[in-house]
Amino acid sequence: MNTVSVVQFLAVGCAVFVLYGRGVFAAEGVKKAGQHKDAELCLGSDGLGHRLDEFWYNDDMCQRFLCFKDDEGIMYEQIANCPIAIAEGDCTLKPGRRATTQTVRPAVESPP
């Protein structure tokens, strides 16, 4: 079987639909970051402190997180999921690799 990234799907001839948000992740939402003992760190969903503009990942859920500060100085945690992909015809969809590879993409497998 051929395995290709969705960026290469035209070469395989399978119909693939991919919904992308910012970059390779589909933005899911933003929430106010919790208060960490160090005021310059975001308290992430993972319970750890993260520096401003730092990315961290949950590979099991294929999620990427970002700590940022708005114009008023309030820290937020941005949560983004991997893109959604649909394969049609004889093609099958393989889940994306780990979220820590910033080029996460689902893959499409086509029959030989």
From Swiss-Prot:
UniProt-annotated location(s): Secreted
Query: Does this UniProt record's set of keywords contain Acetylation?
Result: no
What does the UniProt PTM comment say about this protein?
Contains 2 disulfide bonds.
Q: Which family does it belong to?
A: Belongs to the scoloptoxin-16 family.
| GO MF terms, alphabetically ordered | toxin activity
Is the keyword Signal assigned to this protein?
Answer: yes
Top-level taxonomy:
Eukaryota, Metazoa, Ecdysozoa, Arthropoda, Myriapoda
Keywords on record: Disulfide bond, Secreted, Signal, Toxin
Q: Can you quote a single GO CC term?
A: extracellular region
**Source species of the chain:** Ethmostigmus rubripes (Giant centipede)
What does the record say about tissue specificity? Expressed by the venom gland.
Which coarse location class applies to the principal site listed for this UniProt protein? secreted
Protein name, as recorded: U-scoloptoxin(16)-Er5a
